[in-house]
Design a protein with these regions (language model features):
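Sec-dependent N-terminal signal peptides
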Residues: 4-12
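Sec/Tat signal peptide C-region and signal peptidase I cleavage site
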Residues: 14-18
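Serine-esterase "nucleophile elbow" of acetyl-processing enzymes
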Residues: 20-90, 104-112
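Structural recognition of the beta-strand scaffold that forms the well-ordered cores
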Residues: 44-48, 53, 86-91, 115-120, ...
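Solvent-exposed loop/turn segments at secondary-structure junctions
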Residues: 51-55, 92-98, 122-127, 156-160, ...
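Cell-envelope and extracellular/periplasmic
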Residues: 60, 89-95, 117-125, 182
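Active-site segments of SGNH/GDSL-like serine hydrolases
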Residues: 119-123, 139-174
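Catalytic His-Asp segment of secreted/periplasmic serine-dependent ester chemistry enzymes
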Residues: 156-251
């Protein structure tokens, strides 16, 4: 049974061994999610960005329930059954970070995020590194003024670019986002490095994509797996994988 569980976790995209070094900065949120009524409260996960968190697949089709914001909600609720959790997307398809920064105070902060995710790099190629940097910094600073924990995401793939090219635009934006996460001490989901490693290992990234620049359900699950590091302790992660294994076996 143990070996079947490990095998199915691997097939589902859940890297069990990768969960040994858990991030510690979001301990307070994990504690909040464990509280029962009447001591609990609503926890808001806010996803700000472009078409990918919005759930766009093969445009104009939108598959909200397959996108990583919903996948994260499902997984978090599986492990924290007493938590009241909202997954809120303030993302807009086709938008870049400058546009997202302009509506940040009016449309994002009023949701009172407990965790804020920012995912804009795919579309920031159109405005360049310097303008993107200013926009990301503006959003980060405004959120940190309100003591909101932030998780920055590097981009998911665009098949029209060579992900193995270290000088590609998306690689440059990824490096900039990593520096921002370091400088502002935010969380980081390095989607780009993860997919790049898959390509280096010989995987065909087409299996993760709905179209050239939008992930499919399997591609979103790669992102979800990375995000869940911030929500699960190792024991909780193992419990979640076991539940997923049992669900598959019953089908």
């Amino acid at each position: 049974m143990k070996y079947l569980y490990l095998l199915l976790c691997t097939l589902l995209g859940f890297d069990v061994m990768a969960q040994t070094g858990q991030p510690s900065e979001f301990t307070q949120i994990r504690q909040e999610l464990q509280k029962k009524w009447p001591d609990n409260r609503t926890v808001n996960l806010v996803f700000h960005g472009h078409s990918v968190p919005s759930g766009y697949a093969n445009t104009p089709n939108v598959k909200t329930l397959q996108a990583y914001p919903h996948q994260v909600l499902e997984a978090v609720k599986e492990i924290y059954p007493y938590a009241v959790v909202n997954s809120i997307t303030t993302s807009i398809g086709g938008e870049n970070a400058e546009q997202g920064a302009k509506r940040f105070k009016q449309e994002v902060l009023p949701h009172r995020p407990d965790i804020l995710f920012i995912d804009y790099a795919l579309n920031d190629r159109s405005i360049g590194l310097e303008r993107a940097l200013k926009a990301w910094e503006k959003m980060i600073k405004e959120a940190q003024k309100q003591n909101i924990p932030i998780i920055l995401l590097t981009p998911t793939p665009d098949l029209t670019e060579d992900i193995l090219d270290d000088k590609s635009p998306l690689e440059q934006h990824s490096r900039q986002i990593r520096r921002l996460a370091h400088d502002y001490k935010t969380g980081l989901i390095d989607c780009y490095a993860t997919f790049k490693e898959k390509r280096k290992n010989g995987e065909n990234l087409n299996i993760y994509m709905s179209q050239s620049n939008h992930p499919n359900e399997k591609g979103h699950r790669v992102v979800t797996k990375l995000i869940l590091n911030y929500f699960f302790e190792e024991a909780q992660w193992n419990e979640y994988c076991q539940k997923q294994t049992m669900t598959i076996m019953k089908k």
